Design a protein with these regions (language model features):
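Aromatic-rich, solvent-exposed beta-strand/loop patch
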Residues: 23-50, 81-95, 395-399, 416, ...
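Append "and occasionally in soluble cytosolic enzymes with long acidic Gly/Pro-rich linkers
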Residues: 125-248, 348, 393-411, 420-426, ...
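Local pocket/hinge segments that shape ligand/substrate recognition
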Residues: 76-200, 210, 215-217, 305-325, ...
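Long beta-strand-rich cores associated with HINT superfamily self-processing modules
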Residues: 297-301, 305-308, 368-418, 428-434, ...
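Acidic-aromatic pocket-rim loops
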Residues: 84-115, 264-330, 761-763, 767, ...
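Extracytoplasmic/peripheral linker and loop segments enriched in polar/acidic and small residues
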Residues: 48, 122-131, 135, 179, ...
Length: 854
């Protein structure tokens, strides 16, 4: 397949969504023979290469089956054509780059004094300087010269081309941002901002331009720029380019070229007040194929979510932006009446994020995932917006060996040869934070629900729901808090956990909620042999409430960063009824008029008690032992925490020392016949002891404490050799081997090309010709789209949007016409044109472009 076709395929398939039913409940049931469930392969062997080119060559030669790392265009197209023909290629726009600023103190006079007494003038504390960097960067140059065309300029975290993202991305256009930037404008604005700062009384005579660079007290003001050296063909040259641009603006740059381990530890694990860095070259994996993007607003721009400088960590200096927090929480938690209100709030938050410019996006990157075509015998499932994910290995098939075993060999990339960067902490917000380990544990986890990799629809998995049991009823705000009013009566005997008294209390009469839903739990078993049941859900809700609530200064069962993510969601829960049949019914303030499945998602409980936003899940036995290690102490005397705090040791269920302490704590819990306070009414001491013993047996056998519930379990970790084995889990996983491959098969469209007139006139019709294909996901074999495809273009102007249907010309060819009468109403200039294709009522394939009117 040619380079051009691969790039087009990547961009357009990212938006190829279609409507799918929630068939998660139709997996293997009672009577399914042992061995019929789980993944297609029996084992996965995961190793690491320190060079992407070597890993790619090993995949070509069959030394490994899948290179589970998204290569950029320069590496992939550096392979000879003969080698590429031996590969099954999955090109996905799943990567992106951004620049994170440390804006401390984020207020005039922009000077920060560290604990050592050293004073720094931070130019990135000036909002106008940060904002001007958007024009200092030539994004098109970065894509063309560094990514070799394998990506697109980006201004937001929303992947260009995916449904709904153009609404966010057009804000940058309205602000005047362009892919080429405007170096002259940027330098002028940075200079003006620094001149204004120099006139402040506190900086008078201290801040001045001396020769090429600005100085403070006679020393150059400096941006401490951490640049990822272990991405030598990507973020390293990109970082050096931006450093050169900053120096053109008179700001000296200290180029701190570090690998991912050191960089990540300094940027995300150290208090920004230490002033060890002020700018960082971030790289992101998409994390999921998305239908709704409010979570990205929270994650990438809102301080409450814990991804902005300071990480919402108690005791750290934290960037604050209350208006973004308010808008982001409102959308993320479903506190709105209409889809119009949802979009208005999100777009306002996006605009604030762009103008605050604490995190600046520069490009999306097409990642090329590859598999050996001879060894891997099928096209496995992958995320149209995030590439290889938790569904890839479960649906991949390989040729059996001489013993009849199917062993899949997968390779990761690490410049330093290490598989893991972050601690394996399944409770704290910082655990499992690197994409490498996330990719691995995702194969081992059956989450409560998932966003489908091909449609992004919220779909039941461990927890099941029927849309007939999902109801919403809301009215306008009557209290002045800006939130809708719930109109559903919550039963008086519904309960919530009270952390102060350590009891479950009835909510009483008069409580209302937006929505209610009933859920059942899929019949399944943890990897340690404990059955997953209602007690798992009761425990996790109690734990989340307890650790998110500070009951006095001496409360050790509280962690600020953890609370910052869980508290807003917990506040939406108005009450829950734990039903005698093992199901549960929740009453909650979450409204989503656009999608009823999303309403069901909003009321979910989960056995996952911590590590929000990560593809992890462990049973209550592990979580309780972790909690007691933190609050009671460890046998070794180590002081543990569920956060990255340099003064303590972060929990790590793969670290031998931490595992030893967890075993000691579990044995202590056995001796005491300990029953967690959250489930004291749902469990007898003997049942708790039996659960602890099963967990201990798993840890003893496999040497780690990542007990989960997915289609694979981690059967071996060799941190010295950077080698892992995942083994098929069949006894307690409820879905048949071939279930997911059939479930995800989907006929979708993709827009291959949009021919927009180069010299459109306002006194003549504008004719747009579109080339559209169709294919059955996850296959890459396309054919011209037939007449059942519905195609349209939407012209976006300052006055709004107007859609124009495209007529079917022949298979693969469609034509839309924008009448001259409509164009005559517009002023000369450039207008965004969004092309869409679909088969039915599903979200469309989307391709944005520009119509220039003369």
């Amino acid at each position: 397949m040619s380079r051009k076709v691969l790039i087009i395929l990547a961009i357009v398939t990212a938006a190829a969504f279609a409507l799918a039913g929630c068939g998660g409940g139709a997996g293997a049931g009672a009577g399914v023979a042992k061995g019929d469930t789980g993944p297609l392969v029996d084992k996965i062997i995961i190793d690491v290469r320190m060079d992407q080119s070597i890993a790619a060559k090993d995949t070509v030669e069959g030394k490994t089956d899948i290179f589970a790392y998204g290569m950029d265009a320069s590496v992939f197209f550096g392979l000879p054509q003969a080698d590429r023909e031996k590969l099954s290629v999955y090109p996905v726009p799943s990567g992106s780059w951004s620049y994170l600023m440390n804006p401390i103190p984020n207020q005039a006079p922009y000077v920060w004094k560290t604990k050592t007494g050293k004073e720094y003038f931070n130019p990135l504390a000036i909002r106008e300087v940060r904002y001007a960097i958007n024009w200092l960067i030539d994004r098109k140059k970065m894509v063309d010269e560094i990514l070799l065309g394998g990506g697109e300029p980006a201004f937001t975290s929303m992947t260009p081309g995916q449904p709904g993202t153009y609404r966010y991305n057009i804000i940058a256009t309205k602000l005047g941002m362009t892919e080429r930037g405007d170096e002259k404008r940027a330098i002028a604005e940075i200079t003006a901002a620094l001149e204004a700062a120099a006139k402040l009384p506190e900086n008078s005579g201290k801040l001045r331009k001396t020769g090429q660079f600005w100085t403070y007290k006679g020393e150059p003001i400096v941006v401490k720029f951490i640049i990822r050296v272990d991405d030598p063909q990507g973020r390293l040259p990109a970082g050096r380019y931006v450093a050169d641009q900053l120096e053109k603006a008179g700001i000296k740059v200290e180029r701190l070229e570090y690998d991912r381990s050191k960089a990540g530890r300094m940027v995300y694990g150290v208090d920004p007040a230490a002033y060890e860095w002020t700018m960082y070259t971030e790289g992101w994996g998409a994390g999921a194929t998305r239908r709704w993007w409010d979570v990205s607003i929270s994650q990438m721009y809102a301080p409450y979510y814990g991804y902005m400088p300071g990480g919402a960590t108690e005791g750290f200096w934290n960037y604050k932006q209350d208006e973004i927090d308010k808008l982001a929480m409102k959308s993320y938690n479903g506190w709105f009446l209409t889809d119009e209100e949802y979009w208005n709030d999100n777009l306002k938050a996006q605009e604030l994020g762009l103008t605050e410019a604490v995190r600046i996006w520069v490009c999306s990157q097409i990642d090329y995932f590859i598999a050996n075509k001879d060894r891997v015998t099928n096209r496995f499932v992958y995320g149209l917006g995030d590439g290889l994910n938790g569904w890839s290995f479960i649906t991949a098939d390989v040729k059996p060996n001489d013993k009849g075993e199917k062993i899949l060999r997968a390779t990761q990339f690490s410049a330093k040869g290490g598989l893991f960067m972050s601690a394996w902490d399944p409770v704290g917000v910082d655990g499992f934070s690197d994409t490498y380990v996330s990719m691995i544990v995702e194969q081992c986890t059956m989450r409560e629900y998932f966003e489908a990799p091909n449609t992004a629809i919220d779909t039941p998995y461990l927890v099941q729901w029927d849309l007939k049991d999902v109801q919403s009823n809301v009215g306008p705000d009557t209290t002045g808090d800006g939130k809708p009013e719930g109109l559903i009566d919550v039963p008086a005997d519904a309960v919530k956990y009270d952390s102060a008294t350590k009891t479950w209390k009835k909510v009483g009469s008069g409580v209302k909620s937006y929505s209610t839903a009933k859920y059942t739990v899929k019949d399944s078993v943890w990897h340690d042999g404990n059955k997953i049941g209602l007690a798992d859900f009761v425990y996790s809700l109690g734990f989340q409430t307890d650790w998110s609530t500070k009951d006095g200064d001496a409360d050790l069962a509280y962690e600020e960063a953890y609370a910052s993510q869980y508290q807003p969601t917990l506040e939406t829960l108005k009450g829950v009824i734990f039903n005698k049949d093992g199901s549960f019914t929740t009453y909650y303030d979450f409204n989503w008029p656009m999608d009823k499945n999303r309403v069901a998602y909003g009321g979910l409980l989960s056995p996952k008690a911590g590590n929000p936003g990560r593809p992890t899940m462990v049973p209550w036995t592990i979580t309780e032992a972790i909690g007691l290690l933190v609050t009671e102490g460890a046998a070794s005397g180590t002081v543990y925490a569920i956060t990255e705090d340099p003064s303590m040791t972060q929990i790590d269920v793969a670290s031998p020392a931490c595992v030893a302490d967890l075993k000691a704590k579990l044995n202590e819990m056995v001796e005491k016949k300990h029953v967690p306070v959250y489930v004291k009414d749902h469990m007898k001491p003997a049942e708790a002891v039996d659960a602890y013993k099963k967990t201990l047996a798993f840890i003893e056998k496999y040497g780690h404490a990542y007990v989960s519930n997915g289609p694979f379990y981690i059967s071996k970790i060799d941190s010295t050799a950077n080698y892992m084995e995942l083994s098929a889990y069949r006894k307690g996983y409820p879905y048949k081997k071939d279930y997911w491959g059939k479930f995800f098969a989907l006929e979708v469209t993709q827009i291959d090309n949009v021919a927009i007139p180069a010299n459109a006139r306002r006194d003549a019709d504008a004719v747009i010709d579109l080339t559209v294909s169709q294919f059955t996901y996850p296959s890459d074999q396309t054919k011209p789209a037939d007449k059942d495809a519905k195609v349209q273009v939407t012209l976006i102007s300052q006055d709004g949007e107007k859609a124009y249907p495209a007529k079917y010309v022949k298979d693969g060819s469609f034509q839309a016409v924008i009448p001259a009468a409509d164009l005559a109403k517009l002023q000369p200039g450039s207008y965004t044109l969004v092309s869409e294709s679909k088969f039915a009522d599903e979200a469309p394939s989307v391709k944005p472009g520009n119509l220039v009117l003369f």
